[in-house]
């Protein structure tokens, strides 16, 4: 079975397919994968774990490593190291790794070999028993307590009268007393002058500019709305809140467009102007009708026009 190989190219080499054809003459296409370094750095590509025997970092279109040096960060190196099999090798087309790239490879767990940066085998931890023998260090046997003395008959004498080490008495737990009689003139150390490190200073501009990779748990499932985690740190919570605020503001604008202000309302008077109210002028409107007039609430009508009230329905 041919060894699996991963080719990592820079954006500049994508415009020169002849460079890739030269590489494919050495590495067979059926067992070789090609990924772009900028897509790996942006988190758009996930490399499979423990898959490749060889990872080859291609040089730039001009034969240098300037572009790859800018994109080959610690995060990218960790992804490449995890994609290597045990014993796999990371190589560079431009030559051995130097400087920061070599340091990042070592920090990712790779070791320097003649072929490149190899992924070593992880040995299982071995427990080593430790024997503490104070008598053996002094040349005294732990069995008989003597310096190797033997009786004429071959027996080993036992020194039963030897003084044994007495353990120190355990001090009772209680309130301790501190003697300040000899350091009254010394200044009291309060710890206010200790240098404190601001955690914001540890974040560089490159870390802030790095795109946020959305975890697989935060990606929406088919048929379900996206929901942010309780302790969301990928920005999904802020994004959803901004979307909800935008939808709420657009709905408020649509609702306000349907509301009528006081200036938009007009009062319509159906009464006939210039008439004096008295009984018999019911056709002129409510202003000329009595309190008990049966036409209260009806619009004005022509004098002499017949008005019928049938089942509370007005018929003129």
UniProtKB/Swiss-Prot annotation:
Keywords: 2Fe-2S, 4Fe-4S, Cytoplasm, Iron, Iron-sulfur, Metal-binding, Mitochondrion
Tagged with keyword 4Fe-4S: yes
Chain intervals for the UniProt region annotation (Fe-S binding site A): 218-234
Motif (Cx2C motif 1): 279-282
UniProt motif (Cx2C motif 2) ranges: 290-293
This protein's GO CC annotations: cytosolic [4Fe-4S] assembly targeting complex; mitochondrial intermembrane space
Source taxon at top rank: Eukaryota
Molecular function per GO: 2 iron, 2 sulfur cluster binding; 4 iron, 4 sulfur cluster binding; electron transfer activity; metal ion binding
Region Disordered, annotated ranges: 141-177
Gene3D superfamilies per the UniProt record, alphabetical: Fe-S cluster assembly protein Dre2, N-terminal domain (3.40.50.11000)
Localization per record: Cytoplasm; Mitochondrion intermembrane space
Pfam families linked: CIAPIN1, DRE2_N
Positions annotated to bind [4Fe-4S] cluster: 279, 282, 290, 293
Gene Ontology biological process terms in this record: cellular response to oxidative stress; iron-sulfur cluster assembly; negative regulation of hydrogen peroxide-mediated programmed cell death; negative regulation of nitric oxide biosynthetic process
Subunit: Monomer. Interacts with TAH18. Interacts with MIA40.
Role, per record: Component of the cytosolic iron-sulfur (Fe-S) protein assembly (CIA) machinery required for the maturation of extramitochondrial Fe-S proteins. Part of an electron transfer chain functioning in an early step of cytosolic Fe-S biogenesis, facilitating the de novo assembly of a [4Fe-4S] cluster on the scaffold complex CFD1-NBP35. Electrons are transferred to DRE2 from NADPH via the FAD- and FMN-containing protein TAH18.
Similarity field: Belongs to the anamorsin family.
Protein name: Fe-S cluster assembly protein dre2
Species per Swiss-Prot/TrEMBL record: Pyrenophora tritici-repentis (strain Pt-1C-BFP)
Higher taxonomy: Eukaryota, Fungi, Dikarya, Ascomycota, Pezizomycotina
């Amino acid at each position: 079975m041919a060894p699996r190989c991963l080719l990592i190219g820079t954006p500049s080499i994508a415009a020169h397919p002849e460079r890739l054809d030269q590489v494919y003459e050495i590495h067979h296409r059926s067992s070789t994968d090609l990924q772009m370094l900028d897509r790996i750095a942006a988190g758009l590509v996930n490399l499979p774990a423990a898959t490749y025997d060889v990872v080859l970092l291609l040089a730039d279109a001009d034969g240098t490593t300037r572009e790859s040096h800018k994109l080959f960060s610690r995060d990218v190196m960790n992804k490449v190291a995890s994609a290597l099999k045990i014993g796999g090798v990371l190589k560079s087309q431009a030559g051995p790794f130097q400087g920061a790239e070599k340091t990042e490879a070592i920090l990712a767990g790779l070791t320097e070999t003649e072929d490149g940066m190899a992924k070593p085998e992880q040995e299982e931890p071995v427990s080593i028993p430790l024997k503490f023998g104070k008598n053996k260090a002094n040349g005294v046997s732990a069995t008989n307590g003597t310096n190797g003395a033997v009786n004429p008959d071959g027996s080993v004498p036992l020194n039963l009268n030897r003084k044994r080490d007495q353990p120190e008495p355990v001090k009772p737990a209680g309130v301790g007393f501190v003697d300040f009689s000899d350091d009254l003139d010394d200044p009291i150390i309060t710890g206010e002058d200790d240098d404190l490190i601001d955690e914001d200073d540890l974040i560089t501009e490159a870390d802030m500019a790095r795109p946020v990779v959305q975890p697989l748990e935060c990606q929406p499932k088919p048929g379900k709305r996206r929901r942010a985690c309780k302790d969301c740190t990928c920005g999904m919570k802020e994004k959803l809140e901004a979307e909800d605020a935008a939808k709420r503001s657009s709905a408020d604008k649509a609702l306000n467009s349907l509301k009528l202000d006081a200036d938009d309302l007009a009062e319509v008077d159906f009464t006939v102007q210039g008439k004096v109210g008295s009984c018999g002028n019911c056709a002129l409107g409510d202003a000329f009708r009595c309190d008990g007039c049966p036409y209260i609430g009806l619009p004005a009508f022509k004098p002499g026009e017949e008005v019928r009230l049938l089942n509370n329905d007005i018929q003129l």
